Structure formats: C-alpha cells, structure tokens
C-alpha cells in the first residue's frame, strides 16, 4: 500500500453560481520515502492540496489516506493530533518567534512531540551549530529558514510539507535549502513534499506531480533524481 493515497479529492469554495474549485478530482499515490515535488503556477491549487495533506484543511469530497488512515474522516481534534505528531511544516515565511533564540524556537516545537529528536543535533545537522543563541533578527534569511526547517525536523515527523520554501531566498541560499531537504529525505526515508512554481527544480525529486486548474496534469516517477548541486535555474 502507498504511504499517501489521494482519491477523487475536490475542494470547493462558495455556493450557487459563485463556486471555485481549488482542487477538482485529484488522484495520486506517493510511496514511503519519496521526495515529491508538486509544481504549478500561482492559483493552480497546489497550496490548497498541501493544506489538505497537512490536516490544516479538509476536502469537500474524496479520501486522503496517509499511512493507512483516512484523515478526510477525522474530526478537528483528530486533525490537531495528526498535525502535532505526524507532520512538519516549512513555509516561504519563517514564522519564528522573535524574542526566542534559534535554539529556543526549535526546542518549543520539539516539546509537542513525544518522539522528538535531540534539538542540538538537529541544529548542527542544518548548519547552525554556531548560531544557537542568536535571535531571529540576528540571522540572515537563509539561516532563519534553516531554523524553520530544524523546527519541523525536530518533531521527527513522518511527513515534511514545504510550501515554496525558497520563495523569499536568493538563488545560492535557495539551493542550499533544497539540498538540505533532499538530504533529509534520502538519509531518513521520510516523505518530503515540496510545493513550488519553479519547474526547474523537478529533476531533484523522486516523484513529480504537475497541477493546473485544480487538477493533476502530469504524474511521473523520476528513476534518476539529480543532486541539487547539479541543477541550474
């Protein structure tokens, strides 16, 4: 059985003549350990889909089966537990708490998970060993995003969801963040899903899903993913 199964998922906003189909009969499967890129233009429906996968939103209809459990049937309380225990989130904007140090920001997230990783080890793994006691305002943008990734990883989630994680970063820093995510996926066998409008990064993925007009336009596996260092855009 696939780790993620999305079956006939639609997300519809509005009613009557004023209806928006953000997702329209979406279907795909993701195997355990895959690094998946969901790519599409702005407004294609990819962030809506990511929110549904992360339990931050629910589909109007359809099934979202993750690790053999259909979260589309979950109550709000069950979805809160799912997000807390199983999912890590990385967004374009870092959402760090300004009056906590980098280390404290990550520690705060790790405290909500019963199976969290050693925070100092995670900080070292993301290249922030010497920035533990710095506040967010003292960090560069790429460093702040590394804190956000460490915060997500420290929970030891089965699923790491990343919505335009390099959108606010320069080219060089963005590549370093993508390498960090690729290394995390391949070293831990965890599932990482990256939502992006940048189709040039598709070669780094094990699995590529293209979204347009709320529908899956293409769904393919990549038998030979490239290291991020070999990709240019």
Which residues does each PLM region occupy?
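Conserved beta-strand-loop-alpha-helix hinge in the C-terminal portion
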Residues: 215-233
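ABC family nucleotide-binding domain
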Residues: 2-211
């Amino acid at each position: 059985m696939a780790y993620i199964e999305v079956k006939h998922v639609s997300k519809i906003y509005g009613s009557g003549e004023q209806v928006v189909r953000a997702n329209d009969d979406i279907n795909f499967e993701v195997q355990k350990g895959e690094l998946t890129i969901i790519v599409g233009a702005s407004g294609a429906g990819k962030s809506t889909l990511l929110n549904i996968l992360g339990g931050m939103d629910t589909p109007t209809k359809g099934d979202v089966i993750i690790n053999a459990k259909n979260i589309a049937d979950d109550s709000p309380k069950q979805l809160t537990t799912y997000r807390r225990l199983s999912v890590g989130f990385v967004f374009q904007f870092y959402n760090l708490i300004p009056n906590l140090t980098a280390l404290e920001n990550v520690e705060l997230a790790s405290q909500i998970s019963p199976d969290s990783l050693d925070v100092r080890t995670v900080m070292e793994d993301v290249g922030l060993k010497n920035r533990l006691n710095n506040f967010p305002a003292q960090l560069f943008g790429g460093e702040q995003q590394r804190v956000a990734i460490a915060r997500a990883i420290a929970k030891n989630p089965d699923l790491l969801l990343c919505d335009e994680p390099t959108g606010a970063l320069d080219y060089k820093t963005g590549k370093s963040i993508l390498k960090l995510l690729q290394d995390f996926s391949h070293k831990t066998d965890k599932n990482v899903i990256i939502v992006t409008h940048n189709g040039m990064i598709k070669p780094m993925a094990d699995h590529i899903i293209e979204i347009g007009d709320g529908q899956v336009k293409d769904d393919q596996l990549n038998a030979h993913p490239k290291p991020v260092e070999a990709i240019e855009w």
